[in-house]
Amino acid sequence: MAGVRFLDLVKPFTPFLPEVQAPERKVPFNQKIMWTAVTLMIFLVMSEIPLYGINSSDKSDALYWLRMMLASNRGSLMELGITPIVSSGMVFQLLGGTQLIEVNMDLKSDRELYQTAQKLFAIILSLGQATVYVLTGMYGPPKDLGVGVCLLLIFQLVLAALVVILLDELLQKGYGLGSGISLFIATNICEQIFWKAFAPTTVNKGRGYEFEGAIVAFVHLLFTRKDKKRAIIEAFTRQDLPNMSQLVTTVAIFAAVIYLQGFRVDIPVKSSKQRGPYGVFPIKLFYTSNLPIMLQSALTSNIFIISQMLFKKFPTNVLVRLLGVWDGREGMQQLFPVSGIAYYMQPPFNAKEALADPVKTVIYIAFVLGVCAVFSATWIEISGSSPRDVAKQFKEQGLVIAGRRETSAYKELKRIIPTAAAFGGATIGALSVASDLLGALSSGTGILMAVTTIYGYYEMAAKEGYVDAAI
């Protein structure tokens, strides 16, 4: 790679890529809230607009496992969700962290080229992904659709992906709060939880027509049943529909994550160049935030997708069956693994199922905790947040750890950061497992990603003085 500047290859494309100009002055917090709301509204509208030209299908969704974490909605303009942005960002984070590409983030020109390269790669990924979706028959047999409709579908998907990329850039450049990726994922999850709690629609699961929303059903049962005790028991324990026990579990997981967000180790630091009061460098328990569970979910989802596709093509192959055997569940069109490696990577659907197969439950718990800890400890090395990277930042900013020699900063940070990263990753995994086993209204991964994102917005508001930071 010596002498080769990968980023320079991107320069010719710069004039042709749409870009959000950075604000010339600081954007007021109220305006940031407004732009964030506008961005969110556009995302929600796009999630409800169906793709023009598709043949509706009730077949099992091979991408079912990825939709939640990628803010994707099947058959809509948000079919690709944030997949191109996330994939491009992680690839370039890996390339930059491992120094496979030469980039100096201290130089404005390099930062701009790096961002342009990410955007270009995201557009290329969206084009490739859209083409694969159409040609593999996700929206109907290509021969039946015709060349014109196939091209139109690809155009819609790529254009929608470009809009999402620009919405994310709008927030990242300082017009809004946080990032589009976190906002869209959290919104998708919160929308799912809200619907399961308050849905006014009625369904029949063999017990007569019932309200789908847990709270709506609870109120309805209290007002229509003479035996209030039985009404409450039914509202908390009803099967195949959201119930109040799941809602209470969801609230408890939310509270636990928010509580654990406050756990941190404060390292006292001071300037090595001038006298002054001590500051602190906080190392949070969730040092890598929700990234470990996001990566674990991505790994699991991709294995599920590959396993399901292979099983459909080669259902009798021994190696394919070892990876996973798939079958439907009663009352559901979606396929689920019933044996093989994929089966042990899938969380039990409830506590009853977990107790019925304790071997699977133990393997699943060990898998999630172990993978989250490894991902968390590994990510700090390639994301610029390792002890060596932080010690380098201290040196550049003229900071030293109070009561320690300047040269011992790395040793002190190495003692704390990797432990916090690994333990924090395992804790995130444990919360996710608890949520899955106790049967919350969303997956453990989804709830954790939503809470950490919402808490991040709370911290932004506290920093601006809009809420009490001590809450």
Curated annotation (Swiss-Prot):
The chain crosses the membrane at residues 34-54, 77-97, 120-140, 147-167, 247-267, 362-382, 416-434, 441-458. Residues 1-33, 98-119, 168-246, 383-415, 459-471 are cytoplasmic. Coiled coil: none annotated. InterPro entries: SecY/SEC61-alpha, SecY_CS, SecY_dom_sf, Translocon_Sec61/SecY_plug_dom. Residues 55-76, 141-146, 268-361, 435-440 are lumenal. This is Protein transport protein SEC61 subunit alpha. One of its GO terms (molecular function) is protein-transporting ATPase activity. It is a multi-pass membrane protein. Keywords: Endoplasmic reticulum, Membrane, Protein transport, Translocation, Transmembrane, Transmembrane helix, Transport. Belongs to the SecY/SEC61-alpha family. GO terms for cellular component: fungal-type vacuole; Sec61 translocon complex. Appears to play a crucial role in the insertion of secretory and membrane polypeptides into the ER. It is required for assembly of membrane and secretory proteins and is essential for cell growth. It interacts with other membrane proteins required for protein translocation. Upon binding to SEC62/63 complex, secretory precursor polypeptides may engage SEC61 to begin membrane penetration event. A cycle of assembly and disassembly of SEC62/63 from SEC61 may govern the activity of the translocase. One of its GO terms (biological process) is retrograde protein transport, ER to cytosol. Heterotrimeric complex composed of SEC61-alpha, SEC61-beta and SEC61-gamma. It is found in: Endoplasmic reticulum membrane.
